[in-house]
C-alpha cells in the first residue's frame, strides 16, 4: 500500500488555513521545516560550489520514489545523466534501476561541448514543453532542476533568462508538481543567489553553506523562508554520510526524556559516597581538570564497573591510541582487551582533526545505535574543541548529550583545563550548564608538596559532599582521602592553613551574627 507523503505536522489554531507539506525524508530536514516543503510549490536551494545542492535535489526525488511511490523528473543543466547516475551509486541510490522501472526520468539539458549559436531571441519554450511532456508521461509528482545558474552562464541576456525561468516555475506550479530548484551563490553570507534568482523563485528558499571556521570546514543548512507556513530559524549543522545528507536539528530537540532515580556506580566507592550513592542512570557527568590529574583514570574505572555488571560501554578517545589506553588501564588492574573480547567494551580512537564536529557527532550516534551501550565516555571534549568556534562546539555537545539522554545512556566526559593551579573556568564554551554532574580535579600545593584535590562541584537532583578532598593515584587506582579541613583557599590556588583557634574565632563570629550564645548551642 502506498504510504502518505504528506506531513502530519499540524497547528493548533483552527482559524488558520494550513499549507500542506510533502515529506522529503532527508534526515533532520523534516524536523526543522515542521514537516517538509510545501506541496505543489518550488523550493530554491542556494549555495556555493560543493555545498550539497545537487545531492539535496536528488535525495528528495529518490526518497519520494522509494518511500512514497512518487514518480519524478530530474532536469540537469550541468552534469551529464551518466555522471549523475554514477555519483548517486556511491550513496546506494540506483537511479538507473528507477529509470528502467519507469519511476524516474532524467532530462539532459546540459550544454553541448561543441557550443551552440542562438538565432533570434532566447526562450525556454521547447524545454518547458519537454519537461511538461515528461511530467505527463511519467505522472511525476516531484521535479528536480539543477542548476538554473548554468543557464545564465550559457547566455548573456540575463534579463531574458530570468523571464524564461519565471515562465518555467509558473508552469510547474500550474501543473501542481513539487519542485526543488538549485542555484549558486558567490559568498556564503552574501546575496541569496547569483543573477537575482530568488526574486522570482521566492515561495521557499533554503541556503546551504560550507564555511571555514577556525581550522575546519563546517556545513550548515538554513531555511530562509517557507511562505505561508512555519519553520525553525537559524543555521543547523549537517554532514554528508554514506546515506546522503544528515542534518542535526538541535533546535528541534525536546526536553521530554524520562528521568530515572536509579543509580550507577562510578567504579570508585568513595566517589559514590560523595555523590550520594553514585550517578543517576541517565545523567551526563563532566570531569574537568589539568593534564595528569586523573581524568582518564576515572573514565577507566567508570567503564570497568559497567563491564563488571555485564553492561556494554563505548569509549570515544581523541587524545590517546588504543594501545596506550589499554597499557595505562592495565597498570591500574583494568584489562580493556579482555572486556573487548567479551563484547562488552568498544574503544574508538580518532584524531579530532580527522573530521568536522558534525562527522564526529554522526559517528558517535551511529556507534551508539549499533552497539547499544548503557554507558559512553568521551576523552576528551577539549580535544574536539580545538580549532572550532565556541558555538559549533556547544552545538556538538548538545547533540551528544541530547542523544545520550534520549537513549537513557549514562555519559562520562572529560575536559582538560589550561591552568595547573588556581581557579579556572570549567569550560571556555560554557557547556557546564548542559551537564548534570561536574567533578573538579586540581593540583594544590600544601606545605611545599604537590597534592591532588577532588570535589563534586555540582550534582543535579541529589545531595553531594561539599568538601574538597585529597586524593592520590596508586597502582590500584584512585584513592580518595579526607577533606582538607585545616586549609582554605584551595580552589583559588592559594591554600592557607587555618589554626584551630582561628576556626573557633570564626565559629563565634558566625554564632554572634545568628544571635546565638554558647549556652544556646549546648
Swiss-Prot record:
Modification type Phosphothreonine: residues: 433
UniProt binding sites for Mg(2+) 2: 296, 319
Function, as annotated: Central component of the KaiABC oscillator complex, which constitutes the main circadian regulator in cyanobacteria. Complex composition changes during the circadian cycle to control KaiC phosphorylation. KaiA stimulates KaiC autophosphorylation, while KaiB sequesters KaiA, leading to KaiC autodephosphorylation. Clock output pathways impact the RpaA transcriptional regulator. KaiC enhances the autophosphorylation activity of SasA, which then transfers its phosphate group to RpaA to activate it. KaiB and KaiC together enhance the phospho-RpaA dephosphatase activity of CikA.
Record note on domains: In the homohexamer the 2 domains (called CI and CII) self-associate to each form a 'donut' layer; the compactness and local conformation of the domains varies over the cell cycle and impacts function. CII has the autokinase and autophosphatase activities, both CI and CII have (weak) ATPase activity; CI has the clock pacemaker role.
NCBIfam families: circ_KaiC (TIGR02655), PRK09302.1 (NF006799)
Name recorded for this polypeptide: Circadian clock oscillator protein KaiC
Keyword Phosphoprotein listed: yes
Primary gene name: kaiC
Gene3D superfamilies (alphabetical): P-loop containing nucleotide triphosphate hydrolases
Activity modulation notes: The interaction with KaiA enhances its phosphorylation status, while the interaction with KaiB decreases it.
Classification lineage: Bacteria, Bacillati, Cyanobacteriota, Cyanophyceae, Acaryochloridales
HAMAP family in alphabetical order: KaiC
Organism: Acaryochloris marina (strain MBIC 11017)
Boundaries of every KaiC domain copy: 1-248, 262-522
Amino acid at each position: 500500500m502506498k504510504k502518505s507523503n504528506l506531513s502530519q505536522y499540524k497547528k493548533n489554531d483552527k482559524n488558520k488555513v494550513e499549507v500542506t507539506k510533502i515529506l522529503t525524508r532527508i534526515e533532520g530536514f523534516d524536523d526543522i521545516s515542521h514537516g517538509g516543503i510545501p506541496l505543489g510549490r518550488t523550493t530554491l536551494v542556494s549555495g556555493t560550489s560543493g555545498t550539497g545542492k545537487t545531492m539535496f535535489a536528488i535525495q528528495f526525488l529518490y526518497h519520494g520514489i522509494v518511500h512514497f511511490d512518487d514518480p519524478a523528473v530530474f532536469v540537469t543543466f550541468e552534469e551529464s545523466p551518466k555522471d549523475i547516475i554514477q555519483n548517486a551509486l556511491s550513496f546506494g541510490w540506483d537511479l538507473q534501476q528507477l529509470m528502467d522501472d519507469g519511476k524516474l526520468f532524467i532530462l539532459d539539458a546540459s550544454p553541448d561541448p561543441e557550443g551552440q549559436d542562438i538565432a533570434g531571441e532566447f526562450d525556454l519554450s521547447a524545454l518547458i514543453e519537454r519537461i511538461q511532456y515528461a511530467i505527463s508521461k511519467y505522472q511525476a509528482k516531484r521535479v528536480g532542476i539543477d542548476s538554473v545558474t548554468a543557464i545564465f552562464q550559457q547566455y548573456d541576456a540575463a534579463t531574458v533568462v530570468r523571464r524564461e525561468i519565471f515562465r518555467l516555475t509558473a508552469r510547474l506550479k500550474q501543473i501542481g508538481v513539487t519542485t526543488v530548484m538549485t542555484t549558486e551563490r558567490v559568498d556564503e553570507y552574501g546575496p541569496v543567489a547569483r543573477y537575482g534568482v530568488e526574486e522570482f523563485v521566492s515561495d521557499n528558499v533554503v541556503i546551504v553553506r560550507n564555511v571555514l571556521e577556525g581550522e575546519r570546514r563546517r556545513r550548515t543548512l538554513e531555511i530562509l523562508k517557507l511562505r505561508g507556513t512555519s519553520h525553525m530559524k537559524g543555521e543547523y549543522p549537517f554532514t554528508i554520510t554514506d546515506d546522503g545528507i544528515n542534518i542535526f536539528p538541535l533546535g528541534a530537540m525536546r526536553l521530554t526524556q524520562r528521568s530515572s532515580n536509579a543509580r550507577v556506580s562510578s567504579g570508585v566507592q568513595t566517589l559514590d559516597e560523595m555523590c550520594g550513592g553514585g550517578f543517576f542512570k541517565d545523567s551526563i557527568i563532566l570531569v574537568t581538570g589539568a593534564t595528569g590529574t586523573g581524568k582518564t583514570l576515572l573514565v577507566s574505572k567508570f567503564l570497568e564497573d559497567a563491564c563488571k555488571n555485564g553492561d556494554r560501554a563505548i569509549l570515544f578517545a581523541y587524545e590517546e591510541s588504543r594501545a596506550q589506553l589499554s597499557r595505562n588501564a592495565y597498570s591500574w588492574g583494568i584489562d580493556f582487551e579482555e572486556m573487548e573480547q567479551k563484547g562488552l567494551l568498544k574503544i574508538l580512537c580518532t584524531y579530532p582533526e580527522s573530521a568536522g564536529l558534525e562527522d564526529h557527532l554522526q559517528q558517535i550516534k551511529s556507534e551508539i545505535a549499533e552497539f547499544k551501550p548503557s554507558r559512553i565516555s568521551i576523552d576528551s571534549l577539549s580535544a574536539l574543541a580545538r580549532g572550532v568556534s565556541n558555538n559549533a562546539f556547544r552545538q556538538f555537545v548538545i547533540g551528544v548529550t541530547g542523544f545520550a539522554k534520549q537513549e537513557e545512556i549514562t555519559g562520562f566526559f572529560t575536559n582538560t583545563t589550561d591552568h595547573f593551579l588556581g581557579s579556572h573556568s570549567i569550560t571556555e564554551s560554557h557547556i557546564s550548564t548542559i551537564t548534570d554532574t561536574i567533578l573538579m580535579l586540581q593540583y594544590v600545593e600544601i606545605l611545599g608538596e604537590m597534592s591532588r584535590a577532588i570535589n563534586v562541584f555540582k550534582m543535579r537532583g541529589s545531595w553531594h559532599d561539599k568538601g574538597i578532598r585529597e586524593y592520590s593515584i596508586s597502582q590500584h587506582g584512585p584513592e580518595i582521602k579526607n577533606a582538607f579541613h585545616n586549609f582554605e583557599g584551595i580552589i583559588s590556588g592559594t591554600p592557607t592553613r587555618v589554626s584551630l583557634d582561628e576556626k573557633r574565632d570564626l565559629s563565634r563570629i558566625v554564632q554572634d551574627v545568628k544571635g546565638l550564645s554558647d549556652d544556646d548551642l549546648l
